[in-house]
Amino acid sequence: VRRVSWDNTEFHELHSHFASITHGCLFRNSLAWEEYWRWDEDDTNVAVYYNVKDKPCGYMVYLIKNDIMHIKEMVYLNREAQKGLWEYIHAHDSMIDEVHGSTYFSEPIAFEIDDGDIKESIRSYAMGRIIDVEDFLADYPCDPDGGTLCIELEIEDSLLPWNDRTCNVRFADGHCTMTREPAEYHLKMGIGTFTTLLLGYKTAERLYELERIEGREEAVERLDDVLFHKIPYISDYI
């Protein structure tokens, strides 16, 4: 692990790589990086983890103040980098009494810590909305291993009339398209539920249990088969 400057090229490129493989993560241009550092103190550090081939595989942005390590962000491409960064934190044991920070992976940190005294809290932050269902679906990837599905979706949107419609959507070969071919199933949901589903925050099965989706349970199961289920990673502008 080596400490680098805020504008280090490898550090920025590592984040770009991470964003390219992580659902929901924003790419940061120079303006976004400027905003990222806007409220940070000058003593804030960046530590980059390098593997045996000297390739950067993870980083941590942190500040040590009043015997507390405040972790702003921890990013890693693999398990090796994750363990290396946690070992880096452990190396500061004599300098700190507590570690504070945020995680955006929706992962149970307490499970990783043996006999750790840890407090975790969940804070709602970002809110999403699909503005144009048809345009969104045109660029939306689906699971190519989920088979082929043609489903009639009845979307309710009281604010945007072009979304308030019923349409047949075909999921096949990793893509979804609007179609006029006969549908196998019918499901009904509001635009908020539709956004929650397609962004990966909740599965169709869970939304069905919460009575946010109307239709046959078999249709819900088939829809889950063709969708990816990854909770978005959103760490910017917090």
Regions found by a protein language model. Give the residues of each.
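Intrinsically disordered, low-complexity, positively biased terminal segments
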Residues: R2-I238
